[in-house]
């Protein structure tokens, strides 16, 4: 397992299709697909694109203005390296 400090997000951008672009402290860039998470009631406010777009790096994790957050290990270990992502990536409008 990598050092947790390397797994910390330092930048996040919401993308079309409820994806997140995340850059980590170790300079890895990854894509995290939030669609499965949106099925849970905890994340129901993020089904609204305007709410989803309001994601920020907050301390060691990602957090939305509506209060939801997600563990850094979850996004790190369940995301796809940017270079391996085979689909079109568009910033969310």
Give the label of every model feature segment.
Residues 1-93:
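Motif-centric detector for short Cys/His coordination patterns
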């Amino acid at each position: 397992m990598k050092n947790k400090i390397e797994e910390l997000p330092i930048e996040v951008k919401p993308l079309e299709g409820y994806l997140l672009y995340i850059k980590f402290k170790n300079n890895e860039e990854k894509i995290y697909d939030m669609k499965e998470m949106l099925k849970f009631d905890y994340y129901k406010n993020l089904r609204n694109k305007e709410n989803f777009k309001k994601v920020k790096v907050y301390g060691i994790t990602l957090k939305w203005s509506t209060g939801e957050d997600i563990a850094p290990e979850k996004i790190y270990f369940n995301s796809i390296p940017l270079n391996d992502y085979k689909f079109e990536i568009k910033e969310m409008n």
